[in-house]
Amino acid sequence: MNQKLTEEKKYNEKVLLIKRVSKKIPGGNYISFSALVAVGDRQGKVGIGIGRALEVPPAIEKAISRAKKNLLTVPLYKKTISHEVKLKYKAAKILLKPAPEGTGIKAGSVVRSILELAGVENVSGKIFGSRNQIVNSYATIKALEKLKKRG
């Protein structure tokens, strides 16, 4: 029991998006909530997940558990990424570049949150072509998957 509590607390969570969605059914509208959550340990592990439920808290819990199942290890090099990455995912084009010490995270929206949770401290990032936060977060994860380790 105690080991499970310490294992649960080692990841930081950030809710990136909560949407109220509705579906037309014969009796009217079926309303539920969708949550996009990123989890990370700020030491190179990060993951995202989507959860849907009738209320907001259960949707967030589902998203957190899915994000923990989809963790990715990011190869960090001197608190930044090892090399430049360009990637196209659906409509989103993402560009991530390493930055010198002291620069900070120069990226917007969900890209910044995901990189912070991954433990990257100095990076420059730009998203082109999409403002959809779900697509942008998946594009960021795919770009981080493409990174190769540098010695």
Task: Give the positions of each predicted feature.
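Ribosome-associated RNA-binding proteins
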Residues: 1-151
